[in-house]
């Protein structure tokens, strides 16, 4: 049986691949795929406006190829983990 951290990492990878490739490359998220992922998988996602999601996409897309690859997605998750840590620590 997998340890909780193994399961969590597997889930993060699975969520990326659940949304990636619906519109093209199966290893990247388009702007609309990222928007759907954020809105469906994060509590805060439903509260974000389109302009905020577009800004997030621009910030995440480090190489400016108009998609978010897995490395850019992991960077996003790291930033989210830092925010969650700050909230949980008070």
Swiss-Prot record:
Gene3D superfamilies: EF-hand (1.10.238.10). InterPro entries: EF-hand-dom_pair, EF_Hand_1_Ca_BS, EF_hand_dom, S-100A6, S100/CaBP7/8-like_CS, S100_Ca-bd_sub. Ca(2+) 1 binds at residues 28, 33. It is found in: Nucleus envelope; Cytoplasm; Cell membrane. Keywords: Acetylation, Calcium, Cell membrane, Cytoplasm, Membrane, Metal-binding, Nucleus, Repeat. CDD domains: S-100A6 (cd05029). It is a peripheral membrane protein. The modification N6-succinyllysine is found at residue 47. The modification N6-acetyllysine is found at residues 40, 47. Signal peptide: none annotated. One of its GO terms (cellular component) is nuclear envelope. Its main location: nucleus. GO terms for molecular function: calcium ion binding; calcium-dependent protein binding; S100 protein binding. Ca(2+) 2 binds at residues 61, 63, 65, 72. It holds the Pfam family S_100. Homodimer; head to tail assembly of 2 subunits. Interacts with CACYBP in a calcium-dependent manner. Interacts with ANXA2 and ANXA11 (via N-terminus). Interacts with SUGT1. Interacts with TP53; has higher affinity for TP53 that is phosphorylated on its N-terminal domain, and lower affinity for TP53 that is phosphorylated on its C-terminal domain. Interacts with tropomyosin. Interacts with FKBP4. Interacts with PPP5C (via TPR repeats); the interaction is calcium-dependent and modulates PPP5C activity. Interacts with TPPP; this interaction inhibits TPPP dimerization. May function as calcium sensor and modulator, contributing to cellular calcium signaling. May function by interacting with other proteins, such as TPR-containing proteins, and indirectly play a role in many physiological processes such as the reorganization of the actin cytoskeleton and in cell motility. Binds 2 calcium ions. Calcium binding is cooperative. This is Protein S100-A6. It comes from Sus scrofa (Pig).
């Amino acid at each position: 049986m997998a340890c909780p951290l193994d399961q969590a990492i597997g889930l993060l990878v699975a969520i990326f691949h659940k949304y990636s490739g619906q519109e093209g490359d199966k290893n990247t998220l388009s702007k609309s795929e990222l928007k759907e992922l954020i809105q469906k998988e994060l509590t805060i996602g439903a509260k974000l406006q389109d302009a905020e999601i577009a800004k997030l996409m621009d910030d995440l897309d480090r190489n400016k190829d108009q998609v978010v690859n897995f490395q850019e997605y992991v960077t996003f998750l790291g930033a989210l983990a830092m925010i969650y840590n700050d909230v949980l620590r008070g």
